[in-house]
Amino acid sequence: MNSIARRSAVSVAGLLVAGGVLAGAGTAAQAAPTESTLTVAPPPAPPAEDKRVLEHDYQRQPNGYYCAPAATRIALTTQGEAPSQKEVARKLGTTVDGTDSVDQTTRVLNEVTGGGYETTKISEETAKPEQVDKLRADVIEAVDAKRGVVANTIGTGVDTTGEPHPFPGGHYVSVVGYRDGGEEMKVADPYDPEQHYWMSDDKLGDWIAQRGYSS
């Protein structure tokens, strides 16, 4: 190959190489802005669990007949009131035979907090659907207003794990929260060793049946 042809070949090769580099750079330069300006929407966050539990001070009842004073006190602590169980028992008129009815817990809750509580009775042996609906609505309203609920129960209540809580002579518990739109309720039990458990609204309604609750 003569020198002129060799120089021409080198020049053409140089242009091809340069063109390839430039073309590559141009492709990268065009791709880079696309990558940097591409906005990818994050995956939607999973819905937050519909749950609300009030802050409260749990105390276990000291004997077999102080369930109402203990449950009432737990409810009072959701509103920043923390009297002793003995003081609450005196206000309730509690004796070794227990506390007469939920009317007393409603009265004392209103006396200490300034009002807002009402008594609801379920006189039947099992709660009717409309009574369960009212219980759910009352618990949601009370908890949203930062008021613990006191429930007077009798018989055996079964929590969401299937654990039975038998009180054939009657018992008092506090309801301090709800989840799943109120279909399950957080019970603070002043007698139970576990202290707290969840119970469905219909199971709690049946447990309250023949008694009542303060909300």
Name every feature range the model reports, one short phrase each:
Residues 32, 87, 91-215:
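Conserved active-site-adjacent core of cysteine acyl-enzyme catalytic domains
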